[in-house]
């Protein structure tokens, strides 16, 4: 068939409305886009250069005042330049600077520049990964990246996956597919066995999926926070004896607080012996796949499903999650058909419609930023960055040991360090001082630290995901903790 393509080309027209605010093929919208991007880039670069602290210190009430004074929908628009100045500037000035070396509160990483460049392409092209005709090249990018990831995880040729909004969605999808595999009674009589230190999204996902309130069984952990294999074996036998259905065993490769990696090989053996779906939540520890420490994830290759989050250890902008399946055929329960989207009779022969592997319909082309990062930095570069963060973490733990006012909870597993402030006025008072110290350091823009509870006591937690969080930075933070905590002790009565 001969089609006159030229007849369908839109001739250039003079804009008489606001259409130049919508990126299109015309020269005016391209000019507007370029100017806006350059202004935004300059603002980010200028603010990064000016960021001497990781937070402005403005109170919640102060920020509320800034935003409450803004009319979000004026009758007449201000234009992009003014909007960027009015909104973009305070958004940058009062952001938490995740790239600051003293930002150590959460699994919230600084971002790789290649990924930021990819974000511009992703947003500007606005591809949607539900059907091939909405994302021709982006679909193939995701397929190629997933093939690379399944190889890194040492899964068989039958494996595949899909990109998700993050670990919670990946975990929920895995539990849903495991439940479907077990039949119609799975959610009524089924159980999910996981570590006592597993991410809360496992319990949350089970509740959303309609499992019974007591369906998630927390297996005891050893002193290092790893799931106890004997305890898991005993629970599997007990569940079978009660006539309940073991839907899945969920192992964790990198718990949120301790960074513990469950014994994956032994858990895989138990799951296989009982024909139970094994899911590995490697949202945190999965970054080791890109480093010389891949062997620490031995047993991952036996999983039915794997959660990965690249906005944790792999320096990706939020969000960037992945679910890998050992057998792509297990995605079948998600393969709904719609005549307008992915009809039974394929319009584009052999072209995949990735909606058939996802809980989402409309979905961003997030695989592009991973591909851009891997290509630009390479295997050796990613290994160096990850290893540097691990080295910094071990140095931080050693630094904690040298201070008599701090007590290290234990050696780090990945990139978290837990420790307590020690007070002569007792552990309860130390708990209160720890919480106040955390807030004081953040409000002063000195450091972003987390607190968590371990063995019933409040601990400081450092999460080192930035290669620039060097021992010198950590020493200054630990000194600031001591100075601030002692000052707070002198000004506060016993709780």
From Swiss-Prot:
Could you tell me the superkingdom of the organism this chain comes from? Bacteria
Q: Which Pfam families is this protein grouped with?
A: Pyridoxal_deC
Q: List the disulfide bonds.
A: none
Q: Example GO molecular function term? A: diaminobutyrate decarboxylase activity
Pathway named in the protein's UniProt entry: Siderophore biosynthesis; rhizobactin biosynthesis
* Protein family (similarity comment): Belongs to the group II decarboxylase family.
Record-given protein name: L-2,4-diaminobutyrate decarboxylase
- Species source reads Rhizobium meliloti (strain 1021)
Gene encoding this chain? rhbB
